[in-house]
Amino acid sequence: IAMVMAMLTQAFRYAYEPFVFGKSRDKDNKQVYAQAMKFFIIFTLVAFLAVMFYLDILRYIIGRDYWPGLRVVPIVMAAEIFMGIYFNLSFWYKLIDETRWGAYFSLIGCTILVAMNVLLIPKYGYMACAWAGFTGYGVAMLLSYFVGQKKYPIRYDLKSIGCYVLLAAILYVIAEYVPIGNIYLRMAFRTLLLSLFVAYIIKRDLPLSQIPVINRFIRK
C-alpha cells in the first residue's frame, strides 16, 4: 500500500530531471525549483492523507494475515516523501558539477539505515526497518538541504511548506485518534478532513481560476 508514494516519487523523478536541466540557464531557475519543491511536498501530503484516511478500505487489497503490519505504512510513506525531497534537492550538486556530495549524502544515509537495521531488527522487528528507512532518508535530505544552501542557495518557501506539513499532521492525528466506530461515518469524517486540506491548497496556492476547464466556468 505504501508503494503508492514510491510510484508518485518515481514518476516525479522521471519528469523532473529533464525539466531541471532544461531550466538551468534561465534567470528565474531557482524560483522555479523552489516552486517545484513546494508543490511536490503538497501533493505527496495529499497522497499520504488519502492513503491513511482510507486505509480501512485499502487494506482489503492485501491478505488479512498482513493487516498487523499496516502500522508501518505511515512511517514508510513519510520515508518515501523524504526520499523524494532528497531527490528534489540533489540537483544543486549536479548543476555546479560537484557530484561527490551525492555520494557523501547517500553513504551517510545508507550507513545509518544499515546500522539501525542490524542493531534494532532483532528486538523490534519490521518496525525497526521502517524507522531505519525514515531516519536514513531524513538525514540524507537534511544534509543535502543545509550543504546546498551554502553551495547553491535556493530560497524555498519554508514557512508555507511548514504550514502544509503542520496541517497535514494535525488532520492525521485527528483522524487517528477521534474514535468513530461506524466505518461509514468514519470514512465520511475523514473525507471531510481531506476536503479541508484540499480547500486549504486551493485557497493558498491553487485558485480555481488557474485550473484548466474549471476556469472557463469561472470566467463566465
Language-model region placement:
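Interhelical loop/hinge segments that connect adjacent transmembrane helices in multipass membrane
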Residues: 15, 19-31, 151-165, 211-216
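Membrane-interface helix-loop junctions in multi-pass transport and translocation proteins
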Residues: 97-100, 107-142, 154, 173-192
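Membrane-interface helix caps of multi-pass small-molecule transporters
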Residues: 19, 57, 92, 118-123, ...
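Alpha-helical transmembrane segments of integral membrane proteins
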Residues: 43, 71-75, 101-105, 128, ...
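Membrane-proximal transmembrane or re-entrant/amphipathic helices at the cytosolic face
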Residues: 173-220
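Hydrophobic transmembrane alpha-helices of multi-pass small-molecule transporters
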Residues: 3-7, 48, 84, 110-117, ...
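Specific pore-lining/lateral-gate transmembrane helices of multi-pass inner-membrane transport
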Residues: 1-106
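Alpha-helical transmembrane segments
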Residues: 89-97, 145-159
